[in-house]
Amino acid sequence: FVNNFDGVILSYQNSKVAQEMTAQAIFGGIGINGTLPVSTKHFSINTGFNTTKIRLGYGIPEEFGVSEFDLYKIDSLANNAIDKKATPGCQILIAKKGQIIFNKSYGFHTYNNKIKVGTDDVYDLASITKVSASLPLLMKMVDEGKLNIDDSLSAHLDLDTSDKGGLIIRDILAHQSRLKSWIPFYRNTLEDDTINGVKVLRDTLYDTQESVLFPYKVAEGIYLHYSYPDSIFKTIKYSELREEKKYKYSDLGYYIFQRILENTYSDKLNNLIDNNFYDRLGMENMGYLPLERMDVNRIIPTEQDYLYRSQLIQGYVHDQGASMLGGVAGHAGVFSNANDLAKLMQMYLNNGDYAEENYISSETLKEFTKYQFPENNNRRALGFDKRALEGKGGATCTSVSVSSFGHTGFTGTIAWVDPEYELIYIFLSNRIHPDAENLKLIRMNVRTDIMQEVYNYFGGK
């Protein structure tokens, strides 16, 4: 019977711990090196083989000298944020040296307290999409010799009739290319008149049914005209540049990067990231267009949108510009739970390797994750955010190392990687439910205060 298998694992016990460790051994979450202490019918004493850890594993804080009780402050901070209505719920994940040692959910999907947040539920990552979809594909282009970050945009797109062709990709990625911060594209698709104080969608641009003319699903029962994504790109193409070449965070470059990526590889952005990264990394929950992959009750809702879509946004991207591209954009649109996002972050932490596969060269990753223009008081790397320069604001607590990198999202999210401490911190929430004007999560410093607690216990070597 045993000869029918390539390998057999002997776990000795049928306990919960033994089952979990055996599963991790099979999938490479832990390495094994045990041998048989006695002979059996099919195997002699000392038979065994060694395997190595190749994927994120699951451990406990005690492996690093921290008891679960020590982490009560994280629970307190999360629950206090929920009590103060900074967010209805959240997910928090900590990984240390390749082991997920903390992965918990708090609160509910909404303030009606009907559906508890589960660790498999997904959040709208907002701008974390930039570093989890656009950036890995841009780094792939660099590795393949299809992109030089010091190229001008004109090397990749026909922009001859505008002033955008001379913009340098490195400057765009570091947010100092003079592009505007954002453009509210949706406003030009609304009628001037209102009904009961609510703006009305132009019937020449929207329909309630999908068709060849109206293929882009913006939200439930709202489809945008096929020509409008080109109108968005044209608006960016001819938008006015800022006068000074200084740091100014901008989404607009990622609309441009999406077009470059899709032109280069002749495929849609969601297919590119799925085929080249998410599927290969074993992600079951992460990706664009979550309603095509899971039940709506696993998707955390964001805003009750009164300005544009006149509905609760659930299963559709919150960002209006991304929604006008059918939910797939370079700057927003990816949904995930903390566990899947951690796999991508671990790949970054492993210098581009995961599960014995290389995704990005270490040289490219090193270039993309280092400060680019600190002399301009610009803390950004290429796409990634970094620790603040000389304590001047920023997205992190003060304990992160200078080598660390990550990104935040408007919906109330952060994913951060710290190579010096082999540490990953992820916080996901829907702080904009039901109103994007809710700034309590930001003003209460919830993400950074929890991050500081993580570093208090796991920031050592």
Regions found by a protein language model. Give the residues of each.
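C-terminal non-catalytic regions of proteins with extracellular/luminal or membrane-system context
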Residues: 1-65
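Short active-site loop at a secondary-structure junction
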Residues: 84-91, 113-174, 240-253, 329-332
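Structural recognition of the beta-strand scaffold that forms the well-ordered cores
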Residues: 10, 91-93, 171-173, 287, ...
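Short, surface-exposed loop or secondary-structure junction motifs
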Residues: 166-402
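Short, solvent-exposed loop/turn and secondary-structure capping segments
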Residues: 103-106, 182-188, 288-289, 428, ...
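Short, gly/Ser/Thr-rich active-site loops of penicillin-recognizing serine hydrolases
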Residues: 36-45, 50-52, 67, 350, ...
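Short, conserved catalytic-motif segment at the N-terminal edge
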Residues: 65-125, 146-148, 319, 436-437
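Short, surface-exposed beta-strand/loop micro-motifs that present aromatic residues
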Residues: 404, 411-424
